[in-house]
Amino acid sequence: GVKQLSSIEDEYKGVRQGTGVADNRYSTHSQTTITPSSKIIVMSAAEVWFLRAEAALRYNTGDDVENCYKQGVTVSFAQWDANGVSDYLESDDRPAAYVDVFDAKFNADAPSTITPKWDNTADKEEKLERIITQKWLALYPEGCEAWAEQRRTGYPRLIKVAVKDRKS
């Protein structure tokens, strides 16, 4: 069963890396079980669309960058049976600051102001950030692939680790 370690019931809050979770107020991750018969995603349709968007942006391949970007988001939503893709693609919402529910010393400003809504007037770097940020989200649950994208491009911009002590 799920062990409730905090006073916040029926709600999950993310924990910033490096905050140290030794004090029972935070739940820890669960163990992953992968077997030879586990189904894994080698490359999703969303990843292909985002690769095409990036290639069109960088190398003028003839694909429409905005269309490829929107298709990537759309098929990612479809992959997970998520609703609201049209509203999401029109959203000007920016990433929120991280607010630790127990200790304000771990609070952090949002590292980016990128929105889901495509902006044709943006410069090439902002367009790349938008593409890769959505690609990173779409790569779930393939953490290694998402990590490689972040290392390759620097996107998405992530909140820095609070304490570098190998415990979190």
Where do the language-model regions lie?
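Acidic/polar-rich alpha-helix caps and helix-coil junctions
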Residues: 3-167
